[in-house]
Design a protein with these regions (language model features):
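Positively charged n-region of N-terminal signal peptides that target proteins for export
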Residues: 1-4
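Boundary at the C-terminal end of the N-terminal hydrophobic targeting segment
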Residues: 19-33
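Short, cysteine-centered beta-strand-loop-beta hairpins and adjacent loop/turn segments enriched
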Residues: 47-51, 77-81, 106, 158-169
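Predominantly extracellular/secreted and cell-surface proteins with exposed
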Residues: 64-133
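Tryptophan-anchored aromatic micro-motifs
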Residues: 32-55, 69-74, 95, 146-155
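Edge beta-strand at a domain terminus
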Residues: 137-138, 147-198
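A short, structured loop/turn motif at beta-sheet edges
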Residues: 32-34, 60-67, 88-95, 142-151, ...
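Bacterial N-terminal signal peptides
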Residues: 8-22
Length: 198
């Protein structure tokens, strides 16, 4: 009798756990659909709590993936000519300049792979007093999905590594060993969010 009761309780607990996992999976899928659909604002967050909306990204669902298109707000940037190149930059305690990825970008993401979106958000920073820009001072924002968008934390990259074409142009270059940890609070913009358009 006790053995049968124990078995029944175990089966019920197992069923409840499976149901919970299924619910979590469904919630994650819904979150992924919300994050990868529609128009979102690109917002840079400063270390002092202020925020600056610098553009939008439009996601278009395409089966299990989404295509995206970024439109920067040129009024938030100043044109700079640095190291024989033209950049769109944001001025402040440091100068943050957007660096377009110089090789083909399919602009497709999935809930599990946001690398091509991250590669459309590459930057280089410099001090206002510095002459020119050192491409070794590159930044990529490592994105994590939220319920309705993304949050990204800066990681250090050396943009000189893509001065020549990577061996595999079909794979986003700045992943894994090509990224380096940054101590929180060391950069002017400490995070980026991609959130529902206001």
């Amino acid at each position: 009798m006790r053995r049968g009761l124990f078995l029944a309780i175990s089966l019920a607990a197992g069923s409840a756990a499976l149901a919970g996992q299924a619910a979590l999976g469904a919630d994650a899928a819904l979150a992924g659909e919300a994050a990868l659909d529609g128009v979102k604002d690109i917002v840079l967050h400063m270390e002092d709590g202020k925020a600056l909306t610098v553009g939008t990204v439009t996601f278009t669902s395409d089966g299990d993936s989404s295509r995206f298109k970024i439109d920067f707000d040129d009024t938030k940037f100043t044109q700079y000519f640095l190291s024989m190149r033209e950049f769109k930059c944001i001025e402040g305690p440091e100068i943050l300049c957007h660096v377009p990825y110089p090789y083909p970008n399919p602009r497709v993401v999935t809930a599990r792979d946001l690398s091509w979106l991250e590669h459309d958000l590459l930057f280089v920073y410099k001090r206002p007093a510095d002459y020119g820009a050192k491409m070794a001072h590159g930044l990529v924002y490592s994105l994590t999905m939220t319920s309705d968008g993304f949050i990204g934390k800066p990681q250090s990259i050396d943009l000189d590594e893509i001065a020549s074409p990577p061996a595999d142009l079909g794979t986003a270059f700045f992943t894994g060993e090509h990224r380096y940890h940054i101590q929180p609070g060391t950069r002017w913009f400490e995070s980026v969010t991609i959130e529902p358009h206001r």
